[in-house]
Amino acid sequence: MIRFDTLLFPGGLRRAFTLSYDDGVTQDRRLAALFRDCGLKCTFNLNSGLYGHRFSKKVARLEEDALDEIYAGQELGGHGLTHAALDHLSGAPLAWEIVEDKRRLETHSDRPLIMFAYPFGTWNDAAAEQLRMAGYEGARTVASTGDFRIPPDFLRWDPTCHHKDPKLMELARRFAEEKAEEPRLFYLWGHAYEFDLEDNWQIIEEFCRYMAEHAGDFWACTNGEFIRYVKAHRSLEYSVDGHMIFNSSALDVWTQTDAGPACVPAGGVLRR
């Protein structure tokens, strides 16, 4: 067996798809139901200091007692206690905005939060470092890449595109139908209230139906699931001759070898 170090996703797949929606608004109820119906996974990024806050007739935050029902089966992510621009904060106010939000949200999660979305998409190195110290492992920006690359730094994670991108369906077809030689990630983000404000729910409904039709071709995951899996793959340990691979993580990990796709079991060894 020759080590290739090529990341594969569960089942030996070469494609992964994840979603990220911000602000914890009332329209998330409809959106989360759509994702569940289509077998998709999303990280919903909330501001725990703004539960129930109404901004306009069509934009209102969910009450806290609705979270467990609406986001069942999905992932919660941090978005700052009050949606403050983190690059305008420092010291104790920056720490409080991040850490207190995380503490509150974790009362509605079955595991520690590791994913964050930068409010307004703005950040600096101090904010990223504060997130790391708080236990976050990933943070999404709003800078679209237009491609399917896997980020080298999850705390500065640029998504593929926003759902309003005019090339959304073109990107979906490229992702699902083009031959994938290297691992691919499609990362879509947005705000659910935009569908009501712009009366265009058909955009996300058409997109999700298309992705559901190709469900067997990609791994649908939350942001946090993706991070944990990729880090588990990166932590694989190899013998000098490449005939033995040890997986110290709690996740089964797939990788490409000269013999084809192979699963290295959690806590186990793959030998050839």
Language model features with spans:
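Catalytic-core region of carbohydrate-active enzymes that cleave or remodel glycosidic bonds
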Residues: H108-S109, L131-A143, H163-P183, E205-M211
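Non-membrane alpha-helical structural segments and their capping/turn regions in soluble enzymes
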Residues: G91-W96, P166-M169, E198-W201, E205
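Metal-dependent polysaccharide deacetylase catalytic core of the NodB/CE4 family, i.e.
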Residues: R36-E137, A143-C161, R184-A192
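Active-site metal-binding loops of divalent metal-dependent hydrolases
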Residues: Y21-G24, G80, A192, N223
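Boundary/entry segment of secreted carbohydrate-active catalytic domains
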Residues: M1-Q27, D258
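C-terminal domain-boundary segment and adjacent tail
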Residues: I2-F9, G52, E106, G138-D147, ...
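A short acidic, amphipathic alpha-helical/loop segment
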Residues: T6, R30-L34, A126-Q130, E206-F207
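Hydrophobic "anchor" residues on beta-strands that sit immediately upstream
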Residues: T18-L19, E75, F218
